[in-house]
Amino acid sequence: MSYKPNLAAHMPAAALNAAGSVHSPSTSMATSSQYRQLLSDYGPPSLGYTQGTGNSQVPQSKYAELLAIIEELGKEIRPTYAGSKSAMERLKRGIIHARGLVRECLAETERNARS
């Protein structure tokens, strides 16, 4: 028995089709270009703060990069379970990279909140 998450609870409204249902998991996984499109449409979550016009592109690019890395990490999960050593190493490196980007995004959010 495999775990199938409730995608409707975690997918943005733009990913829902016209009937209000979610596409199958194989077709509903957003690509990095779709994430970037969503990001350019809505921007990163602001946590209730408005961003200044000075460095507003920096957090968006970091956030978009983080989303792209997370998507790439998802591709390494199945080969890792199948025993692929190279996929396991890519997964480890990707997690380390993503953790660094999360720290950078949080620091940027805190800087924007203070200004």
Swiss-Prot record:
Q: What GO cellular component term, any one, is given? A: perinuclear region of cytoplasm
Q: Please state the protein's primary subcellular location.
A: nucleus
Q: Describe the processing and modification events after translation.
A: Phosphorylated in vitro by IKBKE at Ser-46.
Q: Where in the cell is it found?
A: Nucleus; Chromosome
Q: From the UniProt record, which GO molecular function terms apply?
A: DNA polymerase binding
| Region (Interaction with CDK2AP2) location | 20-25
Identify residues that carry Phosphoserine: S46
| GO process annotations (BP) | DNA-templated DNA replication; positive regulation of protein phosphorylation; regulation of transcription by RNA polymerase II
Alphabetical UniProt keywords: Cell cycle, Chromosome, Disulfide bond, Nucleus, Phosphoprotein, Transcription, Transcription regulation, Tumor suppressor
**Family, as annotated:** Belongs to the CDK2AP family.
Q: What does this protein do?
A: Inhibitor of cyclin-dependent kinase CDK2. Also acts as a component of the histone deacetylase NuRD complex which participates in the remodeling of chromatin.
- Subunit notes for this chain? Homodimer. Component of the nucleosome remodeling and deacetylase (NuRD) repressor complex, composed of core proteins MTA1, MTA2, MTA3, RBBP4, RBBP7, HDAC1, HDAC2, MBD2, MBD3, and peripherally associated proteins CDK2AP1, CDK2AP2, GATAD2A, GATAD2B, CHD3, CHD4 and CHD5. The exact stoichiometry of the NuRD complex is unknown, and some subunits such as MBD2 and MBD3, GATAD2A and GATAD2B, and CHD3, CHD4 and CHD5 define mutually exclusive NuRD complexes. Interacts with monomeric unphosphorylated CDK2. Interacts with CDK2AP2. Interacts with GATAD2A. Interacts with HDAC1. Interacts with HDAC2.
Protein name per its UniProtKB record: Cyclin-dependent kinase 2-associated protein 1
Please name the source species. Homo sapiens (Human)
